[in-house]
Amino acid sequence: MKIAVLLSGGVDSSYSAYSLKEQGHELVGIYLKLHASEKKHDLYIKNAQKACEFLGIPLEVLDFQKDFKSAVYDEFINAYEEGQTPNPCALCNPLMKFGLALDHALKLGCEKIATGHYARVKEIDKISYIQEALDKTKDQSYFLYALEHEVIAKLVFPLGDLLKKDIKPLALNAMPFLGTLETYKESQEICFVEKSYIDTLKKHVEVEKEGVVKNLQGEVIGTHKGYMQYTIGKRKGFSIKGALEPHFVVGIDAKKNELVVGKKEDLATHSLKAKNKSLMKDFKDGEYFIKARYRSVPAKAHVSLKDEVIEVGFKEPFYGVAKGQALVVYKDDILLGGGVIV
């Protein structure tokens, strides 16, 4: 089978390509220019080229920087301006990697596209679904909720049945040169955030703009440094007059540049809604597990679809729900889709 492999210049994607090559597939390496500086791109492309030369496969470089900026990066900035906590990876996957890059791979005659994501594809009744990775500590299925069946059927995740701790030893044994590659330290969560998301925002908007902090009764009880520096659940970085116990951000008013704070129990919710839904065609209202944050423990809830809006009712209090984050629905370890929390 002819498969396109997205190569980042790192160990995981290189080993993904190696494992597919060992299985006898015909491969085409693809490097995506999305966000980094030209200096970084040059290094990553050099690393990807070394992997391709080792494997005896071609490498194509696709420049999607303009597309990424308008569809992902700018949306990230806009969401924070609106007082939300965005999830850019959940946008990038369907639009860039499994959108534009997949389209290009198909034009090259490839049947599928592979990446170093920690996830799996499982076919149930001849329909393809995303399944959580074997290594639950590294599982990335949360970021793939917006993919449709037809796209999922064209995906390959070679690392899905492996543990993260085993990848590097396996990769270095198979491809010894990987241990000598120069690289840059990247953010663990968002690829284009090098230090903190606040530093990224400062390049484009006024972040440090002092405002007031109110309690749930609407009384002014303190000050903050600028609403974009806070997310729901944060308990530091603002000043409360005479505070004797911890306070948590429970609300953000972007238009007024105000924070609302309360006690930990005030973060609890028993319901939430999500828009821009992307649920599998056979979805039926019922009891499921949901995640409202990456790495959060799945919570049991009743999930229903009403007028294109996902409505969730929790069995137990659920804490720290932030607008803009992805709400993702699972049946056991099978991903059924999700939406954006409103």
Swiss-Prot record:
Q: Where is this region: Interaction with tRNA?
A: 138-140, 293-294
Q: Which reaction does it catalyse?
A: S-sulfanyl-L-cysteinyl-[protein] + uridine(34) in tRNA + AH2 + ATP = 2-thiouridine(34) in tRNA + L-cysteinyl-[protein] + A + AMP + diphosphate + H(+)
CDD domains membership: MnmA_TRMU-like (cd01998)
Sorted UniProt keywords = ATP-binding, Cytoplasm, Disulfide bond, Nucleotide-binding, RNA-binding, Transferase, tRNA processing, tRNA-binding
What domain of life does the UniProt record list for this protein's source?
Bacteria
Residues bound to ATP are 6-13, 32, 116
| Class in the EC hierarchy, top level | transferase
Q: Which compartments does it reside in?
A: Cytoplasm
Site residues by UniProt (Interaction with tRNA): 117, 325
- Protein EC: 2.8.1.13
Disulfide bridge partners, by residue number = 92-191
Protein name per Swiss-Prot or TrEMBL: tRNA-specific 2-thiouridylase MnmA
- The source organism is Helicobacter pylori (strain ATCC 700392 / 26695) (Campylobacter pylori)
Chain's gene name? mnmA
